Amino acid sequence: MPELPEVEVVRRGLEEHMVGRTIVSAAVVHPRTARNQAGGGAEIEANLTGLRVGATNRRGKFLWLELDDVAQQAPSGLGLLVHLGMSGQMLVKSPDATLNPHLRARAELDDGNEVWFVDQRTFGYWWLGELVDGVPGRVSHIARDLLDDALDIPALAAVLKTKNTEIKRLLLNQEIVSGIGNIYADEMLWEAGIHPRQKASRISLTRLVALLEAGREVMTRALDQGGTSFDALYVNVNGASGYFSLSLNAYGQAGKPCARCGTPIARETFMNRGSHFCNRCQKVR
């Protein structure tokens, strides 16, 4: 599943191509794309058409378009929420582009370009609704993420310190801190030298702050490299893959020597997914 850096890459691409553009038509091709919309795809099509994209925003793994009322020359109060799910792509295409068999929704812009939502596995979705304090109501419960300037890292570390549960479980909880998935949880824990199963309550505040700062640094590096792509399902708006997978130190490195000490990276099952760590550098204390 695309995590924060991958979604941010897509958001930036949409910002370049969509901000200031009016949506002249919209079509929801597959019903699952509008499964969370009370009025289904028809509601999205009717209400999205004619609105102008004022801004693109993101929180964690969710991105959205802030939509303006063209006639009123003011914000409409609506946002189009996009969740990429496991395989979703937002692609900017020319009107003569060959149709993709996994096209699920599309929006035509007033410059002639189209934005396609391509989703092979159909876990992603679009949702059009009101913004609450600038965030789509459907995801207003999602916590701030590590690249959010408004995130108070010491305060978040203090919250983690109160939890007597495994630190990785907390990092994956989108209502505590958003945008972290399996890849970046493993990478930031390796950077900080903390075992995924270490109880958060037994980690010092200083180390918890260092862990969160490491996560911010890892995600920034990933963003600079276009995100992490393991297959053709994650691409930016132009269809290009990221290459941070070449820089991973823990995730997917089972059996390879730790870049810090040379001990083979271990892999174990945790929360129905793989955890990757160094038994020497990341001891349970």
Swiss-Prot record:
Cofactor annotation: Zn(2+)
Residues engaged in binding DNA: 102, 121, 163
SUPFAM superfamilies for the chain: Glucocorticoid receptor-like (DNA-binding domain), N-terminal domain of MutM-like DNA repair proteins, S13-like H2TH domain
MF terms (GO), sorted A to Z: 8-oxo-7,8-dihydroguanine DNA N-glycosylase activity; class I DNA-(apurinic or apyrimidinic site) endonuclease activity; damaged DNA binding; zinc ion binding
Cofactor binding comment, as recorded: Binds 1 zinc ion per subunit.
Enzyme Commission numbers on file: 3.2.2.23, 4.2.99.18
Keyword annotations of the record: DNA damage, DNA repair, DNA-binding, Glycosidase, Hydrolase, Lyase, Metal-binding, Multifunctional enzyme, Zinc, Zinc-finger
Active site: 2 (schiff-base intermediate with dna), 3 (proton donor), 61 (proton donor), 273 (proton donor)
Disulfide cysteine pairs (residue numbers): none
A Pfam family hit: zf-FPG_IleRS
GO biological process: base-excision repair
Start and end residues, zinc fingers (FPG-type): 249-283
Signal peptide positions (record): none
Catalytic activity: Hydrolysis of DNA containing ring-opened 7-methylguanine residues, releasing 2,6-diamino-4-hydroxy-5-(N-methyl)formamidopyrimidine; 2'-deoxyribonucleotide-(2'-deoxyribose 5'-phosphate)-2'-deoxyribonucleotide-DNA = a 3'-end 2'-deoxyribonucleotide-(2,3-dehydro-2,3-deoxyribose 5'-phosphate)-DNA + a 5'-end 5'-phospho-2'-deoxyribonucleoside-DNA + H(+)
Domain of life: Bacteria
Similarity annotation: Belongs to the FPG family.
Role description: Involved in base excision repair of DNA damaged by oxidation or by mutagenic agents. Acts as a DNA glycosylase that recognizes and removes damaged bases. Has a preference for oxidized purines, such as 7,8-dihydro-8-oxoguanine (8-oxoG). Has AP (apurinic/apyrimidinic) lyase activity and introduces nicks in the DNA strand. Cleaves the DNA backbone by beta-delta elimination to generate a single-strand break at the site of the removed base with both 3'- and 5'-phosphates.
Known partners and oligomeric status: Monomer.
Entry protein name: Formamidopyrimidine-DNA glycosylase
Protein's organism: Corynebacterium efficiens (strain DSM 44549 / YS-314 / AJ 12310 / JCM 11189 / NBRC 100395)
